A protein has these predicted regions:
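Beta-strand secondary-structure signal
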Residues: 18, 75-77, 84
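Short, glycine/charged-rich beta-strand-loop motifs at protein surfaces that mediate ligand recognition
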Residues: 33-37, 63-64
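Active-site beta-strand->loop segment that positions catalytic residues and contacts the acyl thioester
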Residues: 58-79
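Catalytic strand-loop segment that frames the active site of acyl-thioester-processing enzymes
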Residues: 1-35
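Active-site helix/loop of acyl-thioester processing domains in fatty-acid/polyketide metabolism
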Residues: 38-56
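Hydrophobic residues in beta-strands and at strand termini
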Residues: 21-22, 64, 99
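HotDog/MaoC-like acyl-thioester-processing domains
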Residues: 12, 79-100
């Protein structure tokens, strides 16, 4: 429900997927926050589950280093051996998740 039309996949590899977020008119951005829209942190996890066909049951660690705004391109990279997923923008880490 939250993810409908939120992003488009622009590149897909075995361990990495690049997406482009929708504009500020998407309901996710309208709710968080109307005058300064940012992507809610929990939505990253929903995107990761959908992109990599995962069922995340435990979040061991989550680190966010900056905000994500509409229209940005994000790259999610998964390291299956360590259960770590990185989210980067222009090669700069913006979020890191350790899951199981």
């Amino acid at each position: 429900m939250f993810l409908t039309n939120l992003y488009n996949i622009t590149k897909k590899e075995a361990d990495a997927i690049v997406i482009e977020l929708s504009d500020k008119n998407h309901p996710v951005f309208q709710a968080h926050f109307p005058n300064k829209p940012i992507l809610p942190g929990f939505i990253h996890l929903d995107i990761i589950e959908e992109l990599f066909d995962l069922d995340i049951s435990i979040i061991k660690k989550a680190k966010f280093t900056t905000f994500v705004v509409p229209r940005e391109r994000l790259k999610y990279t998964i390291n299956d051996k360590k259960n770590i997923i990185l989210c980067t923008r222009d090669e700069q880490e913006i979020a890191r998740f350790q899951i199981s």
